[in-house]
């Protein structure tokens, strides 16, 4: 049984027993390749969420009407990526075992791998829907295979060809794009093709893990991230994508790569909070 976090995300006041969605944080950024600070993302989102209403006019739903439990942040070893991933996998597996949807707050994008390891053990036919500026398909980064630059490559090791669906991708090296052409379903620059994919996911009813790297957003709207990339989507485009893909059989999700200290205006944290609110409401069945 998980116990309540001291400061939970606004509106996430259900007990663990009654919850259908469980938030858990992974404050980890030890493989960051450019600007660190994503480890502070989960705490910042919880704290700043109290400047946000629980009600969404976009969806006419309120967090207080749902069943979300915030279990707080994991205590992770910054010196060992594998140790951190084992802890994340263990928490995700516990939540899945109890019949609830785990929603992970990063942290850098590598944390997704721990959650996907747990998900694919329970759902061997898992598909991954990935919103990101970066392909994250490197075999290794500076010799490290466990890096935020390699996370979708490691996920591919688990799920295989044709089960990773990537959107908004606008950055990566040549080998990553060549790998994607052979092994993943990549949609560059925006969400073109998401409606058709979602229709297929719904028809087949395959289990889906949704991973959202917030740097899919344009840095004019979301500068507070470790590796910003010009040419991203707007908040409203991301919201539309969430509301589209929610129709699929989503069994787990994450939101990652907010580095709050890199945006002293607080706009990035406020945006991340709003994305999380809309995602929570969309996933409430």
Write out the residue ranges for each language-model feature.
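Conserved alpha-helical scaffold segments that buttress catalytic/binding sites
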Residues: 1-285
């Amino acid at each position: 049984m998980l116990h309540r976090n001291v400061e939970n995300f606004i509106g996430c006041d259900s007990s663990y027993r009654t919850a259908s969605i469980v938030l858990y944080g992974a404050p980890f950024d030890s493989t960051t390749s450019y600007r660190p600070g994503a480890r502070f993302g989960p705490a910042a989102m919880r704290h700043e969420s109290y400047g946000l209403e629980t009600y969404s006019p976009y969806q006419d739903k309120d967090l207080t009407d749902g069943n979300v439990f915030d279990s707080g942040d994991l205590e992770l070893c910054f010196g060992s990526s594998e140790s951190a991933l084992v802890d994340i996998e263990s928490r995700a597996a516990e939540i899945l075992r109890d019949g609830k949807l785990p929603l992970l707050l990063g942290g850098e994008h590598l944390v997704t791998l721990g959650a996907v390891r747990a998900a694919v053990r329970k759902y061997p036919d898992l598909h991954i829907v990935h919103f990101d500026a970066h392909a994250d398909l490197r075999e290794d980064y500076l010799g490290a295979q466990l890096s935020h630059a390699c996370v979708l490559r490691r996920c591919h090791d688990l799920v295989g060809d044709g089960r990773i669906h990537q959107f908004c991708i606008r950055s990566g090296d040549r080998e990553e794009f060549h790998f994607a052409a052979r092994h993943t379903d990549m949609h560059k620059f925006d969400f073109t093709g998401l409606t058709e994919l979602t229709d297929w996911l719904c028809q087949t009813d395959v289990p889906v893990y949704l991973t959202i790297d917030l740097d899919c957003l344009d840095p004019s709207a979301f500068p507070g991230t470790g590796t910003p990339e010009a040419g991203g989507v707007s908040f409203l485009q991301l919201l539309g994508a969430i509301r589209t893909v929610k129709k699929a059989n989503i069994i787990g999700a994450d939101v990652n790569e907010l580095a709050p200290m890199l945006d002293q205006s607080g706009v990035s944290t406020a945006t991340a909070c709003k994305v999380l609110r809309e995602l929570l409401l969309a996933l409430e069945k």
